[in-house]
Amino acid sequence: MESQQLSQHSPISHGSACASVTSKEVQTTQDPLDISASKTEECEKVSTQANSQQPTTPLSSAVPENHHHASPQAAQVPLPQNGPYPQQRMMNTQQANISGWPVYGHPSLMPYPPYQMSPMYAPPGAQSQFTQYPQYVGTHLNTPSPESGNSFPDSSSAKSNMTSTNQHVRPPPILTSPNDFLNWVKIYIKFLQNSNLGDIIPTATRKAVRQMTDDELTFLCHTFQLFAPSQFLPPWVKDILSVDYTDIMKILSKSINKMQSDTQEVNDITTLATLHYNGSTPADAFEAEVTNILDRLNNNGIPINNKVACQFIMRGLSGEYKFLRYARHRCIHMTVADLFSDIHSMYEEQQESKRNKSTHRRSPSDEKKDSRTYTNTTKPKSITRNSQKPNNSQSRTARAHNVSTFNNSPGPDNDLIRGSTTEPIQLKNTHDLHLRPGTY
């Protein structure tokens, strides 16, 4: 009875004391409940002495619940050991989801060895580590940071088999909108080039010079997920990452193609808005140029309807073709094909008119010759007038006398004139007629 009362009033300390006494004094297989009263009093004294020397232990002690079968030693629970990689190089789940990436297969859960070519980048851990990547939007990436507290070690002194940078590289800004992704990729590619990784990036004209190493791939994954949070990625980027979350190079290649496409779209729209045609070039060439522009814009997701396209074309017409602006002004259902049909018709008329003018055109020298000389087709003989002009100083009577004397004088010329006249109008100078000079 006394032993039962003792066990009810002091369950933990009495158990501990009994355990120590049993381990030292009781060496038989006798049941501990069948002990004498003297032994019970001795246990009570020892228990009182133990309580005065040891502090009260919590309920989560290593003593088992069965006080009758107490173990001679308290169990020691070993502390959790680190994984195969150092603890400071791993991220927990909460830290890995700072940028919104999925937990499974996250690049930050990969072991991150110190990347020698860019030593300022360590694996993203706590939120405080983001302070070493300030945002400098609109500035050059290779410009040193204005913050004096962020000083990075010189990577040129690092001895490694990888290429090291010779300058401090400024990180790209953090992406904040899906619409700015292509602009962000331009800065990110510049950042990789400044980090001596330009030879692993494909360009518009050539492929990558070499393949990246495992360390470089790890660096690419960490920097991409750090500066491009998943909630701000375009849908086509998320589709690529859903297949392979480490295929950053495919994202960069497709982004470069989209940049070229955007540049071509801007050039096509500019060309379409500044069209000019006056008939100096063939209508077929003009139609082919405009049709190719409209097809490229349509394939790139920028369709232009007939009404807008016709407005662009008519705005660029000049000269005689300007008339088509007013001829087609009130046509509601006008198409590009109809407008080019009118341009072709006007161009053919213009070319036909030029050909007709070239056949009927005569040179000014030929017209001058026709006005001065002629050919006598009825008579083989030609009459040539005397080019000698009479002397104006002589009187009219003297000049008439000279003419009459010239006509009466025999000579071959005078006979020629007589023979050439007709019979009814023969003139005889028998009455001494005085004719005025220049009347024959």
Swiss-Prot record:
> Where mainly located?
cytoplasm
Compositionally biased tracts (Basic and acidic residues): 363-372
Q: Where is the composition biased (Polar residues)?
A: 1-31, 46-60, 137-168, 373-411
Give TM regions: none
Extract the coiled-coil ranges from the record.
none
Q: What induces it?
A: Ty1-MR1 is a weakly expressed element. Induced under amino acid starvation conditions by GCN4.
Q: What else is known?
A: Retrotransposons are mobile genetic entities that are able to replicate via an RNA intermediate and a reverse transcription step. In contrast to retroviruses, retrotransposons are non-infectious, lack an envelope and remain intracellular. Ty1 retrotransposons belong to the copia elements (pseudoviridae).
| Record's subunit section | Homotrimer.
Role description: Capsid protein (CA) is the structural component of the virus-like particle (VLP), forming the shell that encapsulates the retrotransposons dimeric RNA genome. The particles are assembled from trimer-clustered units and there are holes in the capsid shells that allow for the diffusion of macromolecules. CA also has nucleocapsid-like chaperone activity, promoting primer tRNA(i)-Met annealing to the multipartite primer-binding site (PBS), dimerization of Ty1 RNA and initiation of reverse transcription.
The name on file for this protein is Transposon Ty1-MR1 Gag polyprotein
Which organism does this sequence originate in? Saccharomyces cerevisiae (strain ATCC 204508 / S288c)
Per the record, the gene is TY1A-MR1
